[in-house]
Amino acid sequence: MIALPVEKAPRKSLWQRHRAFISGIVALIIIGTFFLTSGLHPAPPHEAKRPHHGKGPMHSPKCEKIEPLSPSFKHSVDTILHDPAFRNSSIEKLSNAVRIPTVVQDKNPNPADDPDFYKHFYELHDYFEKTFPNIHKHLKLEKVNELGLLYTWEGSDPDLKPLLLMAHQDVVPVNNETLSSWKFPPFSGHYDPETDFVWGRGSNDCKNLLIAEFEAIEQLLIDGFKPNRTIVMSLGFDEEASGTLGAASLASFLHERYGDDGIYSIIDEGEGIMEVDKDVFVATPINAEKGYVDFEVSILGHGGHSSVPPDHTTIGIASELITEFEANPFDYEFEFDNPIYGLLTCAAEHSKSLSKDVKKTILGAPFCPRRKDKLVEYISNQSHLRSLIRTTQAVDIINGGVKANALPETTRFLINHRINLHSSVAEVFERNIEYAKKIAEKYGYGLSKNGDDYIIPETELGHIDITLLRELEPAPLSPSSGPVWDILAGTIQDVFENGVLQNNEEFYVTTGLFSGNTDTKYYWNLSKNIYRFVGSIIDIDLLKTLHSVNEHVDVPGHLSAIAFVYEYIVNVNEYA
């Protein structure tokens, strides 16, 4: 999720990008077509091109029912979900946190250099200390890069790898031009009993998860729980600006302490539970993220008076290269270890709305190339879904020329890619060079990469350069089977089947995929088991407000998120 400058048009957040396919999922099921956003099982060995952590089921796709995993220490789960006094107290805690405007921009100073810029973060820290006294009495608090909060609840067995919970303290700005459109002031934290919503910026991204983790641990302390496994909370402060000051520093600090694969599992913000058909629910903790890369493409030519122009200015060359890129999108590459396949499987096996033909195509795809091709065709025809099975490209910025009668010496544009699971930064770079070479040869330009590595020598007209600006490989796939997954999935199953939904057995757990990136991108070397999940039932209309006007969160969803964190901590200690 990327921060937005105040007064500028809102930029689509990671959650906003996902609200589209979540909305589309429900509609697509109703009309009997295809839907996806998340998935389950890895591919058969002969089809998997990329290793994943752990061994997943490699046979017939099945959206099997997970056995609920209920701990013996379950003192307050029912209280969290159903007690009016706890509910009212929780509403107040979340509302008060939303009232503190911990806003970040795209670019932010180092906290030590400009503490006044972060004054509201210090206010939030004081609020935590006053609101959660047991945590601040019994847990060790360390501050990393001034504002990163690291809470450690020491377990009795130092040989056990710690459990790590993540969230971020920061929120995106509010566009001042939208203030009149807000139902309640954006930092009011207003609770509306008619809708059962808490309103305000950050209420659903992600002060809900932040406060849920605090509340769960505070309640465990009140209940007298004593962990044998250490519990760590790592709370960044600039996730909306890519986490370069917060999560990056925290991850480095934790790596020095615990080393490679030193953490049992990591839970951060992510997707939740969706009702994919009437009374059929699927939980989708995210176990993978696409990669990311930005390239700056420069057409470096010569200036002069516009009255004696060449056949093609640098702007013209840039335009044709952009056209070449956009006329040649990346191929669709779908394998069955793509997490989106699991939700398709759940729909095929449990939805009453999908046609038999659709179900046969989904379930038969691993065994029949023709059906796999048909499945890919269906996915690729859904505009909100196709980005999950290919590398995307978007030309987002372009600059060239300064005056009507002066030829532009240089034209530059930026192209952003979200990299498919089985691709890489190098593969994307090579492909971009291929098309740039075609244009360079066509118009007699040289070609270089990263400024000084010439593929074609510079000519009298100039040269084209492609420079890599920022890169992130696709995230490793975390397990969708095995002991760590079983405890996570079993906890989700128990909290929702037996608690939130009151014995509704049409509840399934699978995994999911993000096309954007969370703070977990800095934590890959700390654990093979990274899951992005908030224990709440997804409301489509609610998701439309993320990073936008009238952001809000439903109270029942917030309470279930607390219950999940509470029970997951206990289950990890009892069963891992």
Swiss-Prot record:
Record-listed Zn(2+) 1 binding positions: 205, 240, 547
Record's keyword annotation contains Manganese: no
Cross-link (Glycyl lysine isopeptide (Lys-Gly) (interchain with G-Cter in ubiquitin)): 8
SUPFAM superfamilies (alphabetical): Bacterial exopeptidase dimerisation domain, Zn-dependent exopeptidases
EC number of the protein: 3.4.17.4
Binding of Zn(2+) 2, residues: 168, 205, 268
InterPro entries for the chain: ArgE/DapE_CS (IPR001261), Bact_exopeptidase_dim_dom (IPR036264), Pept_M20_carboxypep (IPR017141), Pept_M20A (IPR047177), Peptidase_M20 (IPR002933), Peptidase_M20_dimer (IPR011650)
Active site, renumbered: 170, 239
Disulfide bonds: none
Residues in the Lumenal compartment per record: 41-576
Reactions the enzyme catalyzes: Release of a C-terminal amino acid from a peptide in which glycine is the penultimate amino acid, e.g. Z-Gly-|-Leu
Signal sequence annotation: none
EC class name: hydrolase
Subunit and interaction comment: yscS is synthesized as one polypeptide chain precursor which after carbohydrate modification in the secretory pathway yields two active precursor molecules. The proteolytically unprocessed forms are associated with the membrane, whereas the mature forms of the enzyme are soluble.
PANTHER family given in the database record: N-FATTY-ACYL-AMINO ACID SYNTHASE/HYDROLASE PM20D1 (PTHR45962), N-FATTY-ACYL-AMINO ACID SYNTHASE_HYDROLASE PM20D1 (PTHR45962:SF1)
Other information: Present with 721 molecules/cell in log phase SD medium.
Family label: Belongs to the peptidase M20A family.
Protein name per UniProt: Carboxypeptidase S
UniProt organism field: Saccharomyces cerevisiae (strain ATCC 204508 / S288c) (Baker's yeast)
Organism taxonomic ancestry: Eukaryota, Fungi, Dikarya, Ascomycota, Saccharomycotina
Gene name as annotated: CPS1
